[in-house]
UniProtKB/Swiss-Prot annotation:
The gene is infA1. PANTHER family: TRANSLATION INITIATION FACTOR IF-1, CHLOROPLASTIC. The keyword Protein biosynthesis applies. This is Translation initiation factor IF-1 1. PROSITE patterns: S1_IF1_TYPE (PS50832). The lineage of its organism: Bacteria, Pseudomonadati, Pseudomonadota, Betaproteobacteria, Burkholderiales. Keywords: Cytoplasm, Initiation factor, Protein biosynthesis, RNA-binding, rRNA-binding. Belongs to the IF-1 family. One of the essential components for the initiation of protein synthesis. Stabilizes the binding of IF-2 and IF-3 on the 30S subunit to which N-formylmethionyl-tRNA(fMet) subsequently binds. Helps modulate mRNA selection, yielding the 30S pre-initiation complex (PIC). Upon addition of the 50S ribosomal subunit IF-1, IF-2 and IF-3 are released leaving the mature 70S translation initiation complex. Component of the 30S ribosomal translation pre-initiation complex which assembles on the 30S ribosome in the order IF-2 and IF-3, IF-1 and N-formylmethionyl-tRNA(fMet); mRNA recruitment can occur at any time during PIC assembly. GO terms for molecular function: ribosome binding; rRNA binding; translation initiation factor activity. The keyword RNA-binding applies. It comes from the Bacteria. It is found in: Cytoplasm. One of its GO terms (cellular component) is cytosol.
Amino acid sequence: MAKDDVIQMQGEVQENLPNATFRVKLENGHVVLGHISGKMRMHYIRILPGDKVTVELTPYDLSRARIVFRAK
């Protein structure tokens, strides 16, 4: 899968789940399971419920996402 194949969307974190996983509600109303990207883990970026985030979805599984950015 090339980097061009990902779908970027905005969303809001609804709740924390175990293992750095979050329930994220997207702009279009869908709710997906999101995990933190490796760079965010390395830099200890914390995510709390209510934070606005940017997620990447693959066309293969639209129920899971990777959280790549937390808006301030």
